[in-house]
């Protein structure tokens, strides 16, 4: 008899529908452990159970910090609205758009921030934040796609960190789970908005 599959934070179909499980055509050595299979088109598909497990782990970890001491970063445009939506509800600091050098390391800067933990949307796009956090010993939680490096990342959340639906769902889940753990929401209570309302507008090139 096979082991019973544990209940996930959201239905498995939602991870597929939002594209959270779909990686790139490149996979770094570390990220292989999160891969479920390679699709016929050559794209790596992530294991939704491992994504779900890491999201739960990240929410538990982040809920131990005072909200105002959590900085959430997104240079990537499709991550900016979800980050702001999360920070409005949790009470953390949103840093979106270009990251000014010295944000975490130069107290003389007007935009200086002194968080206890940093969440980044993409280790490559948000590299400035990752490097600075590492320099001053701030732990980094990151959404990591199959082609990303995990250098200076302390907690990896495997996920499609490019898609607007994917980023909306990920930040919606993190928001809900943090608020549940902090007692703001009941254990079975949802947010007052759907994950689609976390979604950025589509950008046409």
From Swiss-Prot:
Residues of the signal peptide: none
Gene Ontology annotations for the cellular component aspect, listed alphabetically: small ribosomal subunit
GO terms, biological process: translation
Family matches, as InterPro entries: Ribosomal_uS2, Ribosomal_uS2_arc, Ribosomal_uS2_CS, Ribosomal_uS2_euk/arc, Ribosomal_uS2_flav_dom_sf
SUPFAM superfamilies xref list: Ribosomal protein S2 (SSF52313)
CDD domains referenced in this protein's UniProt entry, alphabetically: RPS2
Pfam families in the cross-refs: Ribosomal_S2
GO molecular function annotation: structural constituent of ribosome
Swiss-Prot/TrEMBL keywords: Ribonucleoprotein, Ribosomal protein
NCBIfam families: uS2_euk_arch (TIGR01012)
HAMAP family, A to Z: Ribosomal_uS2_A
PANTHER family assigned to the protein according to its UniProt record, in alphabetical order: 40S RIBOSOMAL PROTEIN SA (PTHR11489)
Family label: Belongs to the universal ribosomal protein uS2 family.
Identification of the protein by name: Small ribosomal subunit protein uS2
Species name: Aeropyrum pernix (strain ATCC 700893 / DSM 11879 / JCM 9820 / NBRC 100138 / K1)
Native organism taxonomy: Archaea, Thermoproteota, Thermoprotei, Desulfurococcales, Desulfurococcaceae
Gene that encodes the chain: rps2
């Amino acid at each position: 008899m096979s082991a019973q599959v544990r209940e996930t934070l959201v239905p498995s179909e939602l991870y597929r529908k939002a594209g959270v499980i779909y990686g790139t055509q490149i996979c770094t050595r570390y990220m292989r452990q999160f891969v479920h299979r390679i699709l016929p088109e050559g794209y790596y598909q992530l294991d939704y159970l491992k994504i779900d497990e890491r999201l739960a782990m990240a929410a538990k970890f982040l809920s131990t910090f005072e909200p105002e001491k959590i900085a959430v970063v997104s240079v990537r445009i499709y991550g900016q609205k979800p980050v702001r939506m999360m920070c409005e509800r949790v009470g953390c600091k949103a840093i979106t758009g270009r990251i000014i050098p010295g944000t975490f390391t130069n107290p003389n800067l007007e935009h200086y921030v002194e968080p206890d933990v940093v969440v980044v949307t993409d280790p490559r796009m948000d590299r400035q934040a990752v490097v600075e956090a590492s320099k001053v010993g701030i732990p980094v939680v990151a959404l990591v796609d199959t082609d990303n490096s995990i250098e200076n990342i302390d907690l990896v959340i495997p996920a499609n960190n490019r898609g607007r639906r994917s980023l909306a769902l990920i930040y919606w889940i993190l928001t809900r789970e943090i608020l549940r753990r902090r007692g703001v929401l009941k254990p079975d209570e949802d947010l007052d908005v759907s994950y689609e309302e976390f979604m950025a507008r589509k950008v046409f090139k």
